[in-house]
Amino acid sequence: MRLFLSLPVLVVVLAMVLEGPAPAQAAPEISRTFERIPDKLKEFGNTLEDKAREVLETIKQSDIPAKTRNWFSETYNKVKEQLKTAFS
């Protein structure tokens, strides 16, 4: 039953895709596209910057860096003590 329903839907979707864009959806002039590239790149850069700042602030506010630093310090001190006792 599912196959009978999915095949016509698949055929309709495939026909729409192969038909191509409608005339109203045709690509604008290439010069307009090139004119908008710097604006799009600036917008992309701004959103990327904002997201990176949010991530960094989240990391700074969390206690993960402090816990990681403490764990490395403790592990380093343990290894150092073990080496001292082993080679003494």
UniProtKB/Swiss-Prot annotation:
Protein name in the entry: Apolipoprotein C-I
GO cellular component: high-density lipoprotein particle; very-low-density lipoprotein particle
Gene designation: APOC1
GO biological process per UniProt: lipid transport; lipoprotein metabolic process; negative regulation of cholesterol transport; negative regulation of lipid catabolic process; negative regulation of very-low-density lipoprotein particle clearance; triglyceride metabolic process; very-low-density lipoprotein particle clearance
Keyword annotations of the record: Lipid transport, Secreted, Signal, Transport, VLDL
A single GO molecular function term of this UniProt record: phospholipase inhibitor activity
Pfam families: ApoC-I
Species annotation: Ailurus fulgens (Himalayan red panda)
UniProt xrefs under PANTHER family: APOLIPOPROTEIN C-I
Chief location category: secreted
Family: Belongs to the apolipoprotein C1 family.
Compartment(s): Secreted
Record's function text: Inhibitor of lipoprotein binding to the low density lipoprotein (LDL) receptor, LDL receptor-related protein, and very low density lipoprotein (VLDL) receptor. Associates with high density lipoproteins (HDL) and the triacylglycerol-rich lipoproteins in the plasma and makes up about 10% of the protein of the VLDL and 2% of that of HDL. Appears to interfere directly with fatty acid uptake and is also the major plasma inhibitor of cholesteryl ester transfer protein (CETP). Binds free fatty acids and reduces their intracellular esterification.
